[in-house]
């Protein structure tokens, strides 16, 4: 009897986990107004003997050292997050109004 109860609860847990995963994936897939990117800065970082990490000097200070726990080497990465919903909804007329115009100079 205990084995059947345990098996039933285990199956119910896997079904609930599957539903939760499906909901999370479909919710994240609909986030077209957010953008997250990670770029490699072309260098690595290492942990020094005093515990500090070597600096990542690329891209005007945008690069940071990311490493796994317990590892003495890492990667210099630049991360960017943009939430496009902060900018509102631009219409075609807004974009046209913000576009640069050619100056008309008369020559004599």
Swiss-Prot record:
Got a GO cellular component term for this one?
extracellular region
Task: Please state the span of the N-terminal signal peptide per the UniProt entry.
Answer: 1-28
UniProtKB keywords: Disulfide bond, Glycoprotein, Secreted, Signal
Q: List the disulfide bonds.
A: 41-63, 45-65, 56-76
Superkingdom: Eukaryota
Quick one: where is this thing mainly located?
secreted
Q: Which GO terms describe its molecular function?
A: C-X-C chemokine binding
- Glycosylation-annotated residues: 44, 89
Enumerate the subcellular locations listed in this protein's record, separating them with semicolons.
Answer: Secreted
What does this chain do? Salivary chemokine-binding protein which binds to host chemokines CXCL1, CXCL2, CXCL3, CXCL5 and CXCL8.
Q: What is this protein called?
A: Evasin P1127
């Amino acid at each position: 009897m205990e084995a059947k109860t345990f098996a039933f609860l285990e199956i119910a847990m896997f079904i609930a986990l599957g539903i939760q995963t499906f909901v999370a994936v479909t919710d994240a897939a609909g986030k077209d107004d957010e953008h997250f990117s990670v770029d490699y800065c072309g260098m690595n970082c290492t942990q020094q003997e005093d515990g500090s990490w070597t600096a990542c000097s690329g891209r005007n200070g945008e690069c940071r050292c990311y490493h796994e726990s317990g590892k003495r080497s890492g990667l210099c990465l630049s991360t960017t997050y943009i939430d496009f919903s902060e900018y509102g909804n631009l219409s075609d007329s807004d974009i046209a109004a913000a576009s640069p115009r050619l100056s008309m100079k008369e020559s004599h």
